Every structure is written in structure tokens, then in C-alpha cells.
């Protein structure tokens, strides 16, 4: 590790421990890259209250708009997807039929606005869905997104929290891109090496911190708090330490075990540490075999949706797995999907 990155890491660590700024919510994401094209991505959803998530299946051929008034981006979905919502007003996680996984996580440093920006508008609630609808690979997505042809509109969430978020996308080859809006500019980090993402600080600083802990050595000591930077280091160590295997029966549970390792126990409340939020659910995407796994903290079973068994043709209906009333599913849940209308994406102005 070079001297400059050591200096950056130490400076950021000092700032994190001395700062009075607390993160309200948190999540962790990690991608496993194994032999024989075995790629598995897991994430936790950590939130200070029930985020009222449901699972939806979207077919191809849906006509969408990135905003509900004025000049916006419009498209027709090329790919079907399985997604998880937040508050049933936006897509926060999912995988499309090509094995592209997209995950939206909290980033308090996000600033989307540029002075006098007149570009077409894209709502933050539909940004993740835009990626899943339109791209099969990270390279395709990055080539288009780096053009910055739209601006992001980010209204407050239903609970009043700021929609300060960043997006991670990973394709079936294991290539990942981290997308962060900082001071109105889109910053993109793309590499197969970028296997882990959490929250604050901005991604380049997280990489520097992780470099520092690599020098310490995970077998000697790992940071154990629920801080974003500590979870990043633990997830990074374990995602590389678990067995290298082409067997999905080993790879998927291994990634799930990493996600459990970085989860925050349910019901944890620490008055002087409001940045600690309970893990509400975990997802794991087997991108080689196109299977989306989901585990709620409050239900006893893991369930999954095999995308190969789902009809994504344009004539197919939108389908839903309801999760907000204590529903319990186990194993292959394709049979439990019900025809449904879509949820309404949240934009700055009310949809009339």
C-alpha cells in the first residue's frame, strides 16, 4: 500500500472517530467471485424502522418515465426483473433476467444538484429500475450513465429521511460499478475488484481505509463496530476468505453467512449512537443461475425466486410477493407470486 493511501486512510479514520456526524441508516453489500463463473451478490437492508418492502416481478415491455411532469427520460423495459421495494415507492434492490444486480444504499455525502441544471429529470425512486430495465452488463450501463444526460430528483422519503443514496451494480461476470453523486457530479468506480460497498465515507475513502486494514491483517484483528467503515472491512475480509467453489449449494450460503456477519441485531437501539440501525432483511443473488434469495429478519425461512421459471414476456402480468403483513414463504416461492398492479414511484410532486 502506498504512502499516500496510508495517509488518506489514517486521516479519514481520525475524522470518522472524532466527527459528531452520525449516520441514520446503513446497509452492506458484497460480491463473491468464484470459479466457473460463479458470481453471487449479497446485501443487507438496515433501517431504523420497518421499510415496508415487498417483492415485485416486472416483465419486459413496460413503458416508463423517469419523472411525472416536465422533461424527463422515457423508456420501454428491455429486460424483466425481480425487485424489492422500499416503502413501496421505489426499487432499492433487484436482479434482471440477464443477471445484472442493482442495489441502492445510504450515502449521507450525496449531493445531486448543480446550479441552474436544466437536464431532463430522473427520480431517485426509479433510478435503480431504470438500470435493471435497460442494461445487461455493467459496461453497457456505465457507457450510458457516464453521459450524464439526466439530473436526479431526490425528495424526502415517507419517514422524512433525506434520499441521499448511492448505487452499486454488478453483472454476471462479477464486474461492478459504484455510482455516487458528489457535488452534483456523477462519480463512477468500475472494477471487478470493487466487491464491497457500505455507506459513508465516499467510496474512494472506503477503499483507502480497507487498504489500511489489509496491512493489519484480518487474521490478527478486524474492526468490530457497526460503523460503515468497519462493516466494509469485515465484509471485504470474509467475502475473500470464504471457500472458492463453483457449487451454488456452498457459494450462496457462504455469501449469506457473510451478510449475517455484518448485520445489526434486530431491536438494537443505542441512544448515543443513532447511526446504528437494525437489519430488516437480506438478499442474495446467484447471478450465474439467475436465482434471487430473500430473508426477512422477522420470518423464519429463506425463500427464493428462480428467474428461469418466470414468464418475463411483454404479455405477462406484473406479479407480487406481499411481505408487509407477516406473510411467510419458504423455498421456491415462484408458485406464491400473485398478479398485481405496480406500486407508484415517488416523485417530488404528487402523482395525480
Question: For the regions a protein language model found, what residue spans apply to each?
Answer:
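Bacterial N-terminal signal peptides that target proteins for export
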Residues: 1-10
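C-terminal segment of classical bacterial N-terminal signal peptides
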Residues: 16-23
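A contiguous strand-loop segment
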Residues: 25-119, 152, 330-331, 336
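C-terminus-biased signal that marks the final domain/tail of proteins
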Residues: 25-31, 35-39, 153-155, 162-163, ...
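Short acidic-glycine loop/turn motifs at beta-strand connectors
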Residues: 33-36, 96-98, 171-174, 180-185, ...
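Structural recognition of the beta-strand scaffold that forms the well-ordered cores
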Residues: 40-42, 101-104, 168-170, 178, ...
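Proteins synthesized as precursors that undergo proteolytic processing into mature forms
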Residues: 121-154, 248-257
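Catalytic cofactor-binding cores of redox enzymes
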Residues: 147-184
Amino acid at each position: 500500500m502506498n504512502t499516500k493511501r496510508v495517509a488518506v486512510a489514517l486521516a479519514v479514520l481520525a475524522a470518522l472517530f472524532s466527527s459528531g456526524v452520525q449516520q441514520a441508516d446503513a446497509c452492506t453489500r458484497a460480491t463473491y467471485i468464484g470459479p466457473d463463473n460463479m458470481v453471487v451478490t449479497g446485501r443487507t437492508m438496515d433501517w431504523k424502522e420497518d421499510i415496508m418492502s415487498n417483492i415485485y416481478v416486472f416483465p419486459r415491455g413496460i413503458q416508463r418515465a423517469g419523472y411525472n411532469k416536465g422533461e424527463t427520460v422515457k423508456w420501454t423495459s428491455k429486460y424483466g426483473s425481480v425487485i424489492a421495494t422500499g416503502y413501496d415507492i421505489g426499487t432499492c434492490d433487484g436482479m434482471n433476467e440477464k443477471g445484472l444486480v442493482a442495489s441502492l444504499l445510504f450515502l449521507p455525502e450525496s449531493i445531486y444538484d448543480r446550479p441552474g441544471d436544466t437536464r431532463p429529470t430522473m427520480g431517485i425512486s426509479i433510478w435503480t429500475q431504470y438500470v435493471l430495465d435497460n442494461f445487461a452488463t455493467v459496461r453497457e450501463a456505465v457507457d450510458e450513465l457516464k453521459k450524464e444526460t439526466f439530473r436526479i430528483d431526490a425528495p424526502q422519503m415517507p419517514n422524512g429521511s433525506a434520499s441521499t443514496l448511492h448505487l452499486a451494480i454488478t453483472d454476471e461476470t462479477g464486474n461492478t460499478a459504484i455510482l455516487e453523486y458528489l457535488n452534483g457530479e456523477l462519480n463512477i468506480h468500475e472494477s471487478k475488484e470493487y466487491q464491497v460497498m457500505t455507506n459513508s465515507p465516499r467510496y474512494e475513502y472506503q477503499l483507502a481505509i480497507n487498504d489500511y486494514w489489509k496491512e493489519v491483517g484480518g487474521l490478527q484483528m478486524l474492526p468490530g463496530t457497526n460503523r460503515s467503515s468497519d462493516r466494509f472491512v469485515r465484509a471485504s475480509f470474509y467475502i475473500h476468505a470464504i471457500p472458492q467453489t463453483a457449487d451454488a449449494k456452498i457459494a450462496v450460503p457462504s455469501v449469506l453467512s457473510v451478510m449475517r456477519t455484518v448485520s445489526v441485531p434486530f431491536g438494537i437501539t443505542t441512544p448515543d449512537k443513532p447511526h446504528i440501525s437494525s437489519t430488516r432483511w437480506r438478499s442474495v443473488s446467484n447471478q450465474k443461475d439467475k436465482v434471487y434469495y430473500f430473508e426477512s429478519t422477522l420470518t423464519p425461512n429463506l425463500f427464493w425466486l428462480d428467474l428461469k421459471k418466470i414468464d418475463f414476456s411483454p404479455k405477462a402480468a406484473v406479479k407480487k410477493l406481499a411481505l408487509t403483513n407477516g406473510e411467510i414463504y419458504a423455498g421456491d416461492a415462484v408458485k406464491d407470486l400473485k398478479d398485481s398492479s405496480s406500486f407508484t414511484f415517488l416523485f417530488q410532486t404528487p402523482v395525480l
